[in-house]
Design a protein with these regions (language model features):
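Acidic di-acidic motifs
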Residues: 16, 87, 118
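Conserved active-site tyrosine of GNAT-family acetyltransferases
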Residues: 20-25, 95, 121
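Short, conserved charged micro-motifs
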Residues: 19, 88-92
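Vicinal oxygen chelate
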Residues: 1-8, 31-82, 92-117
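Conserved beta-strand-loop-alpha-helix junction that forms the acyl-donor binding cleft
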Residues: 14-17, 39-40
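Short beta->alpha transition motifs characteristic of CBS
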Residues: 34, 126-127
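Short hydrophobic/aromatic beta-strand micro-patches
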Residues: 11-13, 82-86
């Protein structure tokens, strides 16, 4: 018999906490749901939630002298995060105005989606 579980959130490491909070709140419209300093890791964590469905993204930042502040490698084990938006063209225009470049735009099977980068280079899918 397997364990019963419920998926709760995704945590990503960031190199500049305030810059990342700005991106996820001002570009993607998420809201800060919590913030904590963690002495054991010499770090800080910030919870962000989407308004529509309550999805939670956890941003994890570690001070320079933290043993958890290791070389940052974009994409190691993480492909992308996806967000549904009301208007893809408007979302891309707003991201561009905020200084975030569109990496790729796709069309297939009657759908459209695009990828932008967060401040640490993680790919963010908008559809």
């Amino acid at each position: 018999m397997s364990m019963k579980s419920k998926f709760m959130y995704v945590g990503i490491r960031v190199t500049d906490l305030e810059r990342s909070i700005d991106f996820y709140t001002n570009t993607l419209g998420m809201k800060v749901s919590g913030r904590s300093k963690i002495e054991q890791t010499k770090g800080e964590t910030v919870g962000l939630q989407t308004e529509k469905d309550g999805f939670t993204l956890e941003l994890n930042y570690y001070e320079k002298d933290s043993p958890y502040n290791t070389k940052y490698v974009v994409g190691e084990g993480l492909d992308h995060l996806a967000f549904k938006v009301d208007d893809l063209d408007k979302a891309l225009e707003e991201a561009k105005k905020a200084g975030h470049r569109t990496i790729l735009q796709m069309k297939a099977d009657g759908g459209r989606w695009a990828y932008i980068e967060d401040p640490d280079g993680n790919w963010i899918e908008l559809f």
